[in-house]
C-alpha cells in the first residue's frame, strides 16, 4: 500500500515520463519528409505538400518542424495564404505547450493576415487559445477578459469558429477557478452554436468538456448523450481521414477514460475492463504524457475497486521506473 501511495503522490504532483523521446526512427522519418519537400519545385506544389504534412502531423515531435517549414517556405514564396496556415499551425503548437507569450506573438501575425486571407477564423480561434494558456497559469481574471473580448470580436466578425473557441476558453477559465455552473453555461452555449462550419476539433473539445462537468457532478444521464456524440464525431472524422488518426489520439483516449469512469461508477466492471483494454491500445509514443498518466491512474482505480491488488502492484512495478527516472516536466494543470 505504501508503494501505491508513493506512486500516486508522484503522479499527481505532475512528474511524468517523456514518452515522446525523439528516437532515431522519428528523426529519420522527419528528415525523409523534408527531403521529399526539397525535391519538389519551389512553387505551389511544394507548399501544398508541406501543408499536407503539417495537417497530418499535429502532434510532437513533428508538429513544430513541419509547421515551421511550411511557414518559412510560404514566406520565401510570398504566399500569404500558406504563410497564414503555417502561422496558424505554429500557434497551435504553442497552444499545446500552454505558452501565452508565444501564442500572443503568432496571434498578432495571424491578425495581420486577416485582410489577405478573407477570414477571421484562424486569428480568433488562436486568440481564444491565449485565454486557456493564461488559465493554466492561474491568471484567471486575465483569461476571462481575453475570452470575453474574443467572443465579442467573433460575434462582430461573424466568426463561428472564433465564437465556439471563445466560449470554450471562457468555460475553461471558470472551471479552473472552481465555478462549474458558469463553466457549463459557457460550454452549452458553444454547443448550441455548433454549425456545419464549426471545426471538428472544436466540437469534440466542447463535447468532452460538457461530459466532464456533468460527470463530475454525478449527472450520468445528462453526461452520456454528449459522451456518445463525442465518440461518434471522433469515429466519423477518423473514418473519413484515416491518415490523420494520430491527431485525434488524445481525444480518443479522453473519450475512453470517460467511458471507463462511467462504467466503474455503475459497477459494470466487465464493460469498464473492455474500455481499459481498448484505451491501452491507443498508448502509442506520440500520445501526450498527460493522457498516458490518466490511463495509468484509471487502471489503479479499477484494480482498487475490483480488489485486484496483485495487478495493482504489477502495474506499479511496470510504470514506476519510467515515471521516476524519466520525467521531464511538471504540468501546472491537467486537462479540464
What is the meaning of each model-derived region?
Residues 20-336:
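A "functional boundary" signal
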Residues 4-15:
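Sec-dependent N-terminal signal peptides
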